[in-house]
Amino acid sequence: MINRTKHFLMIVLLLAAFLLCGCAGTAQEPVSTPEPTPPPTPVPTPEPELPQGDPVTVEGVNLESGSVVYNDALYVSFQEFAEALGAELSEEEGILSFLWQDAAVGCKPGNPALYIRGEAVALRSPVKTYRNECYVPVQVLCELLHIGMFYDEEYAHLYCTVAAGDWQIPEGYKVPVFMYHGVTDEVWGSAELFVSPSVLEEQLKYLVENGYDPIWFEDLREVEKYDKPVILTFDDGYLDNYTDLFPLLQKYNVKATIFVITGWLGGEKYLTPEQVTEMFQSGLVSIQSHTRSHRDMDTLMADEQREQMSRSKLDILRLTGKEPTVLCYPRGLASNTTLELLPEYYSFGVKMNGSVYYTGKDPRVVTRYYVTRGTSVESFANMLKK
């Protein structure tokens, strides 16, 4: 019995020793600690899209972003508007501003006001930050800068443009105005209407070499800046105004005004709409109205005259994005009704041949010197000196 007990104890001891040896020789598996789950990355709330408004053109420049509708008003990019005006933006103390003509206008994101000449003008809704730019109500901005607004209902397009009628023009300045028509050696119709390109070039050289300043009617508001202002006008909008006249204007860097008959654009021997736009965008050519169909204004009823004035005005606005301010009367004819209606649509009315023009005279009857095919450089110079 004792032997069996010893034997049993021996077995137990051997088994315990074996188990102890096995545990000592076997490495324990490391216990892995799970890494903490990172918190989810917050997803930025997307900026709500504002309803797109109508296309907007400012002084002939289309705003790339157009307009948006915010609180029932049309808003435009403050930065784009300034760029369209050719104004330089600056920022100080969080206020973004630009200077245009004699007015400094500014805005601050989130502020319920615009600033004009340092004075705050309250807005119905605050300045909106949208697409990383400041958006402001276009109507208020135009009113502060005295920029007119014209809405083209047919094409749902808004034009912001300055009319000469809003300017104060200094009085008593002598400004010779010259009337041309075609510029070509290929004469057709009435020969006297077509000046040879070589003769016109001599006339342009004379102007440049003798210190004359060819300007537009739009420049009369600052006429005192020019020593010898002169206005060159070309009636009817013939095709040669693009093929022969335009290259000469570019060569001598001279400004000119072309009076187009808008209903005849694209016709044989007349400018195309695309050519009109190209010349306007060059910065050398002002496009003004010669009515829509060249009918004698003094023979038309009042409503017919309105149609001639308004339709040609709209046609030019669509081509250039800038409101025309001058009407050239077909054949120089204008009735009392014409003169009464003119200020509703234009700031200047231009007749045919006459005497030198002085600022301050009746702007509805601007007189011009007639340059024909037979006008020599000497005769041209004499007209300048009268």
Positions of predicted regions on the chain:
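Substrate-binding clefts and substrate-entry loops adjacent to catalytic sites
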Residues: 288-303
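Short, well-structured secondary-structure segments
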Residues: 176-179, 213-217, 231-232, 250, ...
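Primary recognition of N-terminal secretory signal peptides and signal-anchoring hydrophobic helices
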Residues: 25-173, 178
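Charged helix-capping and loop-helix junction motifs
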Residues: 269-275, 304-308
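C-terminal active-site subregion of NodB/CE4 polysaccharide deacetylases
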Residues: 165-233, 239-240, 299-386
